[in-house]
Amino acid sequence: MNNGTKLYMLVEEKPIGIVSVTKGLIEDLYILPDMQNMGHGTKLLLYAVGQCTDTPTLWILENNINAERLYRRIGFKETGRKNAITNKLDEIEFALT
């Protein structure tokens, strides 16, 4: 996985989700809106974690409460690192420790 991998989730042969994994960095986790709140995001995230070769980390926008809830439920914790996206919005790093 040194160059990164995109993982797709299919339901009845239709793509409903995607996530990218590069070493330990998990990015772009997305589940179609009409397929959310059914456990698909959790399953895809857990699979992505299993593909990581380094400590699983990810970044979320500070106002993305739903994503934060999912990541915390799996065991991710804030690392204390932040990136300013705009002067009013930060991106926060989480890691699975």
Model region roles, listed by residue range:
Residues 1-8, 25:
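A short helix-loop-beta-strand connector motif used in the catalytic cores of GNAT acetyltransferases and
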Residues 42-43, 63-80, 84-92:
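Conserved active-site alpha-helix within GNAT-family acetyltransferase domains
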Residues 16-19, 24, 29, 92:
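Conserved GNAT-family N-acetyltransferase fold
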Residues 5-17:
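Conserved beta-hairpin
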Residues 26-36, 60-61:
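A short, internal acetyl-CoA/4′-phosphopantetheine-binding micro-motif in the GNAT/acyltransferase core
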Residues 34-35, 39-47:
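Conserved acetyl-CoA pyrophosphate-binding loop and the N-cap/start of the following alpha-helix
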